[in-house]
């Protein structure tokens, strides 16, 4: 990343603001929910067969909305089983929101929540240091592998925790998405070298293929309205640009040349389609399910 530009994740408040706006402007949650309710139940039906207690790990759980939907589907497939749910999330605000959501919900008596305010890497270090032997029946890592140094090693570690019938669910942006094109073009300019911000499911699949690993994969069509990005000085447009580039205050810190190039690419058919005066960015997600 160019020295004048800082990573968006260095400012938790602005990151959360831009992330919430991204969710409002995109069909991300809807397409993930459709997958959870229409495809995931059959996958969950095959985990922990006959067990009366299931171990779940949510890595990068955020504010918990998606976690609770997954746990609800798991419960419908294994109604008699109690669940031990490890929540791994480094943001204090997100964890607070998750806990508040749990308090609002009824019928969660079958779940015990273990709150881990830490990164995936810190969780792995603690797990290894304590020589934990507990196996997981289901692990989900949704939109979080961008924030680790080595996504392949993180994937391998969590896969190693699975029980015999356990499954690991990974959701990231698809290699065929606008993100894939954007990151391929500008990885060196605005991706933080300390983490793997520019990783897509195509990268993870290449790694798994090189190991000869078996997995299922799915593509989830999604769009994001980025029209506001093209109005100079628009506050929401600037937030969306920060989220797209993962650069803090991108419009103010990028050179005019880089900004112009990025804006041109965002409008390019490889990244977006224009419809009814709106610019709709290809936000397709990829899903990988590992045994």
Swiss-Prot record:
InterPro entries: HHMT-like, SAM-dependent_MTases_sf
Amino-acid positions noted as binding S-adenosyl-L-methionine in the UniProt annotation, renumbered to this chain: 60, 89, 94, 142
GO biological process: histamine catabolic process; methylation
Residues annotated for substrate binding in this entry: 28, 283
A GO CC annotation given for this chain: cytoplasm
Pfam family, one: Methyltransf_23
Places the protein is found: Cytoplasm
Protein name: Histamine N-methyltransferase
Species of origin: Tetraodon nigroviridis (Spotted green pufferfish)
């Amino acid at each position: 990343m160019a020295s004048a530009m800082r990573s968006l994740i260095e400012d938790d408040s602005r990151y959360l603001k831009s992330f919430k706006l991204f969710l409002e402007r995109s069909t991300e949650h809807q397409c993930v929910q459709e997958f959870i309710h229409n495809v995931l139940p059959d996958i969950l039906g095959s985990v922990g067969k006959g067990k009366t207690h299931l171990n779940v790990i949510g890595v990068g759980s955020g504010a918990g909305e998606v976690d609770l939907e997954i746990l609800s589907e798991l419960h419908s497939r294994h109604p008699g089983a109690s669940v031990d749910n490890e929540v791994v999330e480094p943001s204090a605000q997100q964890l607070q929101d998750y806990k508040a959501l749990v308090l609002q919900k009824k019928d969660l008596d079958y779940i015990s929540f273990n709150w881990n305010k830490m990164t995936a890497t810190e969780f792995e270090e603690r797990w290894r240091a304590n020589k934990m032997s507990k196996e997981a029946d289901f692990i989900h890592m949704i939109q979080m592998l961008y924030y680790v140094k080595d996504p392949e090693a993180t994937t391998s570690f969590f896969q190693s925790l699975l029980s015999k019938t356990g499954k690991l669910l990974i959701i990231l942006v698809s290699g065929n998405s606008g993100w894939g094109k954007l990151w391929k073009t500008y990885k060196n300019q605005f991706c933080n070298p300390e983490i793997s911000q520019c990783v897509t499911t195509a990268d993870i699949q290449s790694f798994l293929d090189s190991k000869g690993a078996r997995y299922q994969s799915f593509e989830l069509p999604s769009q994001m309205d980025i029209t506001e990005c093209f109005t100079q000085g628009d506050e929401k447009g600037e937030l969306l640009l920060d989220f797209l580039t993962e650069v803090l205050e991108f419009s103010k810190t990028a050179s005019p040349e880089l900004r112009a190039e990025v804006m041109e690419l965002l409008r390019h058919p490889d990244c977006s389609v224009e419809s009814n005066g709106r610019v709709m960015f290809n936000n397709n997600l990829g899903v990988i399910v590992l045994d």
